[in-house]
Amino acid sequence: MATTTFLSNATINITQGATTTDLSDQANACTITIGVDPLESTAFGDTGHRFTGGLQTVDVAITFFLSYGAAEVEAILASCVGLGTTILTISPSGTSETATNPEYVLTNCMLANFTPINSTVGELATVEASFTGGTWVRDVTP
C-alpha cells in the first residue's frame, strides 16, 4: 500500500470580535482534538453498556512564539482570555480547503488562561495556548 508523506504547514487564524489575525508565522505546533460527550443510553434488557453522542467537545493546543505589540501574539491572546467567543480557523497546509486539506472552524472556544511572559536566557520565548469548548465544523469545499 502506498503511503503519503505529509509536511505540515498549518494555517492558524484567530478571530475575536470583528478582528481576524493570521498567526501561522508565529506558531510551530498545533493539535486539535474533537469529539462528542458520550451519553449512556443503556436500557433494561441490554447485556452491555450503550452510548449515544451528546454535545460536541473541542480542545486545541497551539505553541506560539511570544511577540509583543499591538497586533502580536501576546496582545491577541490576552484579548481572548475568558471570553468564550473566540473563533479558530485551522487547516493542515495552506488556505485552500480540499478533501486532502480539511479546514476546521472552531466557534466559541475559550482560552481560560495563558502565560504572557515565559523567558529563558538564550531561548526563544514560547507559550502554549489551550482553547476549549465551543463547536466544530470540518470543511472540505474550496
Where are these regions (language model features)?
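Signature of extracytoplasmic/envelope-associated structural regions
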Residues: 1-142
